[in-house]
Amino acid sequence: MFVKKGDKVKVITGKDKNKEGVVLAAFPKQDKVIVEGVNVVKKHQKPNQAAPQGGILEVEAPIHVSNVMVIDPSNGEATKVAFKEVDGKKVRVSKKTGEVLDK
């Protein structure tokens, strides 16, 4: 999967199109990511020990990884990602600028 936790991404399709956010969690087996402030849904929480009040919460739901693009940190634009080997390590590289995305 080309998206990792902590990446800044742009949503390219769906109800939250053109929104940007940081990846909070990535689920490679399901090909889904949770993006901060994107795909917010209302969750009905029953009262329990942790939250005795309960109520309706707004939480981010996962979206499919094909609906987001990584934002290139050098120019701030959405870009495709390629994998290259640098110094014997597999790293992610921006296809627009050739900049290495991994820290």
Swiss-Prot record:
Tell me if rRNA-binding is a UniProt keyword of this record. Answer: yes
**What PROSITE patterns would the database entry show?**
RIBOSOMAL_L24 (PS01108)
Example GO molecular function:
rRNA binding
Top-level taxonomic group? Bacteria
UniProt-listed InterPro entries: KOW (IPR005824), Rib_uL2_dom2 (IPR014722), Ribosomal_uL24 (IPR003256), Ribosomal_uL24_CS (IPR005825), Ribosomal_uL24_KOW (IPR041988), Translation_prot_SH3-like_sf (IPR008991)
Instruction: List the Pfam families hit by this protein, alphabetically.
Output: KOW, ribosomal_L24
Query: Which BP terms from GO are recorded?
Result: translation
In its keyword annotation, does this UniProt entry include ATP-binding? no
Give the protein family.
Belongs to the universal ribosomal protein uL24 family.
Q: What does this protein do?
A: One of two assembly initiator proteins, it binds directly to the 5'-end of the 23S rRNA, where it nucleates assembly of the 50S subunit.
Query: PANTHER family per the record?
Result: MITOCHONDRIAL RIBOSOMAL PROTEIN L24 (PTHR12903)
NCBIfam families xrefs: rplX_bact
- Under what name is this protein listed? Large ribosomal subunit protein uL24
Gene that this sequence comes from: rplX
